[in-house]
């Protein structure tokens, strides 16, 4: 556990973490192209931490155009073992008000234009997605959120739509009938690729 390396992938509205000191910006290349932006390397509580803005600083990359494979591959190159993904989402339930956090444990992937695997050329592999998030990493996120006295929910299902348009009313009602909790555009195929790269993954979402 002492050799764990954490990366935070920031979503809409989270493009930097100013509290991180001793900052170094890393410009990486991958076989899949460039990641969304430079990766911030820093130390927090004497631990090495990395930060990557999913949409690029200034939010110039739309969800469908994010190079998810390059993002995950770049973090793998850095030896990252754990990813905490932070995203803004919409609520599908009346009892989940704006400002509440949820630590998601399941996904429904409704995207259809994105490259979703590292294994589509020369090598074929099939990984289990039954449990796409790490229970241990979820527990760590819960502890941090609880210490900050933030309203949260642990567990839930995230519908990931293609975007950039929002869902129709009929689509939202369909997702509610599936018992989904939230809807957004960014955690797929990110979670699948992290799984293929053998990086533990947890998703902390903010209802907006």
Predicted stretch roles:
Residues 122-133, 162, 169:
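Polyanion-binding loop/helix "lid" in catalytic or ligand-binding cores
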Residues 136, 140-151:
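Generic non-transmembrane alpha-helical segments
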Residues 150-181:
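Active-site/ligand-binding-proximal alpha/beta "capping" segment
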Residues 207-208:
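Conserved small/polar residues in nucleotide/adenosyl-binding loops
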């Amino acid at each position: 556990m002492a050799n764990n390396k954490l990366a935070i992938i920031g979503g809409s509205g989270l493009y930097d973490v100013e509290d991180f000191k001793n900052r170094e910006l890393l410009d990486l290349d991958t076989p899949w192209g460039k990641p969304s932006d430079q990766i911030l390397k820093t130390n927090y509580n004497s631990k090495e931490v990395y930060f990557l803005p999913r949409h690029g600083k200034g939010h110039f990359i739309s969800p469908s155009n994010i190079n998810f494979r390059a993002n995950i591959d770049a973090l793998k190159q850095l030896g990252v073992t754990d990813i905490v993904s932070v995203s803004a989402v919409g609520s599908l339930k009346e009892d989940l008000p704006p400002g509440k956090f949820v630590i998601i444990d399941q996904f429904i992937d409704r995207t259809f234009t994105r490259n979703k695997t590292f294994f589509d050329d020369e090598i074929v592999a099939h990984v289990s997605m039954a449990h796409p998030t790490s229970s241990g990493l979820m527990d760590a996120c819960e502890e941090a959120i609880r210490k900050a006295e933030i309203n949260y929910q642990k567990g839930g299902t995230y519908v990931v739509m293609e975007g950039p348009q929002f869902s129709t009313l009929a689509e939202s009602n369909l997702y509610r009938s599936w018992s989904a909790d939230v809807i957004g555009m960014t955690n797929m195929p990110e979670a699948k690729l992290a799984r293929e790269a053998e990086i533990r993954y947890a998703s902390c979402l903010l209802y907006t």
